[in-house]
Every structure is written in structure tokens, then in C-alpha cells.
């Protein structure tokens, strides 16, 4: 709050980056490890759309840290905008968008406005097309409307297919106790220049790549 109100966006962003770095280090105390794998060249400049499966709230800190130079912003449910120290404030004021899925027309308009902002500022939009997190880690069906809206509003984007494994294990007991020695992995499965892809075919590719990379129980 101090950084945002008194020092502006850049200071706020750096404080969020380092907050999430230290959240990861705190989990290291429990033997939790985070491995990020990316064999692809991601442009240093230009907007991104990061498409990922969703297993727990512990997906968020490594995405923020490992993609920090791209300014990741999230599409999140509105209930997370209150009640979580630091996290809720960042969702409200850090450039992300909060939506109520029950109000679909308004939600899509908010995603449209969010996409325009990402395109203009050359940020990274992070979307979990499953809608809700998978409590057992197994992939759910991808919903297309939100992602297709981002495709329309961020035509210059590089699209990142990101697969997350094992973060669900950190939340399997309702976040307490947190199991010891969990190995969480984030792997970029592929990248696509949006302008070179047909949107529906790209959506199908992304779902196949990401869901296919999730470890089976």
C-alpha cells in the first residue's frame, strides 16, 4: 500500500515481486521446491498471454516471480479482492481484473477492458481457462470465452502454454498442515505468435498441450 500510494506503479510492482520471492523461500523451509523450465525464447518486449492449468493459490507466487520482467496480471474471481493480506490489495490496484463469473456479460466486458490495458502496456495477461482450481491436480475442461476475448483484445501477444504440476498437494489439507518435501514444477510447453494462429485451433492446441502435461494420479 505504501509503495503504491506514495511511490507509484514501479515501486508497487517491485514490492510485489519481492514479496512473492520471499513467499517461495518460506515454502523452501518445508522442503518445497519450485522448478521452472522454459526451453523457448520469449520476447523481452510485447504483450504476453500466459495460459495455464490451475491447481492452487500457490500457482500465483512462482508465476509472478519467474515472469516478473513481463509484468504478469491476473484474471481472478472477485471474492479474492478482499480478505487476503497483500494479495487482495495487489489484485485490486496492481493491474489485474476481478470478475464475478455469475455475471457473465459484465465479466466479459471487464476482460475486454483488461485485455486492452495489457495490449497498451505490453504486460502479461495470466488466465486459467479451467475457471476454478483442480483440488486433485487433474485437468478440467477449458472454457473458451475469456481466452477468446483476450485473443481479440491483445492481437500482438505471444501466447505461452504453461503447465503446473503438484501445487495442489500444498493445499490438499485446506492449507494446513502443508506437506513436507513437495516438488512443484512449472513448464512452458510451447509458445505461439497469436497473429500467426487461427484462434479456435490455437485454443484446442493449448488445452491439449497443457492438459496432456499434467501428471496423472
Where are these regions (language model features)?
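A cross-family acyltransferase "interaction/gating" segment
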Residues: 85-88, 124-126, 132-200
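Catalytic core of membrane glycerolipid acyltransferases/transacylases, capturing the structured
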Residues: 2-9, 13-16, 44-103
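Short coil/turn segments at beta-strand junctions that form active-site/ligand-binding loops
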Residues: 45-47, 70, 121-123, 157-158
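Hydrophobic alpha-helical segments of integral membrane proteins
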Residues: 15-26, 30, 90, 146
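A short, well-structured juxtamembrane/interface segment
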Residues: 23-48
Amino acid at each position: 500500500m505504501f509503495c503504491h500510494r506514495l511511490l507509484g506503479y514501479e515501486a508497487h510492482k517491485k514490492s510485489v515481486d519481492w514479496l512473492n520471492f520471499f513467499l517461495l523461500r518460506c515454502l523452501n523451509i518445508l522442503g518445497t521446491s519450485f522448478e521452472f523450465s522454459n526451453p523457448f525464447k520469449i520476447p523481452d518486449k510485447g504483450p504476453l498471454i500466459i495460459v495455464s492449468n490451475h491447481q492452487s493459490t500457490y500457482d500465483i507466487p512462482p508465476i509472478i516471480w519467474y515472469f516478473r520482467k513481463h509484468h504478469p496480471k491476473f484474471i481472478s474471481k472477485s471474492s479474492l479482492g478482499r480478505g487476503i493480506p497483500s494479495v487482495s490489495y495487489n489484485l485490486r490496484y496492481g493491474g489485474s481484473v476481478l470478475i464475478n463469473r455469475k455475471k457473465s456479460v459484465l465479466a466479459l466486458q471487464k476482460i475486454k477492458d483488461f485485455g486492452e490495458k495489457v495490449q497498451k502496456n505490453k504486460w502479461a495477461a495470466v488466465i486459467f481457462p479451467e475457471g476454478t482450481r483442480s483440488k486433485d491436480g487433474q485437468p478440467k475442461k477449458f472454457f473458451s470465452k475469456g481466452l477468446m476475448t483476450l485473443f481479440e483484445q491483445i492481437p500482438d501477444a505471444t501466447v505461452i502454454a504453461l503447465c503446473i504440476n503438484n501445487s495442489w498437494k500444498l493445499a490438499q489439507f485446506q492449507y494446513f498442515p502443508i506437506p513436507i518435501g513437495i516438488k512443484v514444477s512449472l513448464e512452458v510447453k510451447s509458445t505461439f505468435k497469436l497473429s500467426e494462429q487461427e484462434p479456435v485451433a490455437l485454443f484446442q492446441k493449448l488445452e491439449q498441450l497443457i492438459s496432456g502435461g499434467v501428471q496423472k494420479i
